[in-house]
Amino acid sequence: MYKLLPILLFAYGLALTTEDIYDNSWALIIGIDKYENVSNLDYAVKDANSIASLLKDNFNFPSKNVTVLLNEEATFTNIRNGLSKVSSSAKANDRVLIYFAGHGETMDLPDGGEMGYLLPIEAKRDELFTTSIPMDDLKRISSMSQSKHMLFLIDACYGGLAATGARGLSSSTPNYIDKITKDKARQIITAGGRGEQVVEKSEWGHSAFTMNLIKALENNKGDLNNDGYITAEELGLFLKEKVTIDSDNMQTPISRRYTSDEGEFVFINKVENIIINEATINIVDTINTINYMSVKLL
């Protein structure tokens, strides 16, 4: 037993890394809190900068692959160009993350449906069709990209997601990690639905959604089954619970898929993994010392 335990612990410490799953990582980060034609927000730019830093520092997103558009940079044209560039740059074994912090809006359609929009800095609520980014565009971009995994994190509330509610594989599925990291994934998590409000507080210095997104990723709190991986599905469940509570039920995050693929966008926190690996090595060293002393006593 003593000889097997170090092997098991060491194997656990050498879990899959980001490089084992993805060849490259790409991100488009958008934050707008100073609008030209609609009300301002307080922390969208700070939220966007925090997420960009977290991706680069903890999750192996190369700085050259992370595009950040803030306030006056986040125009209708620049956002569309950014979406096109990041999605087309990714290759077949890459991942793409798109984060937006700003206003969302919902338009009623003549057929009784609804369309959600992301509002660029110059957006006009009475001219959404010509001044804003429809959610259908996100779905189209996700289908055009070669990337293996794509995740949209939208810190805005609106309806008309144009996505399905399908759930992914259960973590109890045999070879779960192997399956979710090889199959394609097109996933989206939004801060809330139509008629809800993005909650920001000075005591947080963030919105409720991004504050909890940071907690989920930075401290591995989004790793609900403690297997060392944070999947987009786990992230959605974590955000739904925490944001609903912190916002006093003013917003409830929504998680959806654009396709029926069963893959999962995966986050592996390299900083947390270093801590785990160092702890594992210390435990192995301790057990080996005990084994050595036991042999000497015999």
Name these PLM-found stretches.
Residues Y2-K3, V295:
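N-terminal leader/targeting segments
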Residues G13-L298:
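Cysteine endopeptidase catalytic domains of the caspase/legumain-like
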Residues K3-Y12:
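Sec-dependent N-terminal signal peptides
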